[in-house]
Amino acid sequence: MSKTNEEVAVISTSKGEMVVEFWPDVTPKTVENFKKLANDAFYDGTCFHRIVKGFMIQGGDPLTKDPSEEGRWGTGDPGYKIEAEFSDQKHVKGVLSMARSSDPDSAGCQFFICLKAASFLDGQYTCFGELIKGEDILESLGDVDCGGEGEGSRPEERQ
């Protein structure tokens, strides 16, 4: 799914490629973690498993590599958690942020990209980069047909 080079990553999807630029000066540990996972091919074969129209697309779960695990998608992790790195950065369209549970220090590998501003996440989720290429791809992913709502909002086709 992702390849990194310096401070950018290419995220390949069924709709095309998106390029995100990291903010290592804002969230160094989160950027380091994402880059390590991407460079170790951790994200290869994963998909965007949760799409909430008008909000965000979420990916990075290693369980999405196996369609037989679909009932558990959204629960996968790399075997560890990282500490939150909250900042003054805003969750606006195209911002890359870490997904987590209700525990602020529970992020590991799952991430999301905002489809529009989500100020209610500001200061509560670790945003660590932004989309610099592929806004049309982001919008296309955000418009795919999904089943379910909220936590269970899954694209009907693999993304």
Where on the chain are the PLM-derived regions?
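Cyclophilin-like peptidyl-prolyl cis-trans isomerases
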Residues: 1-159
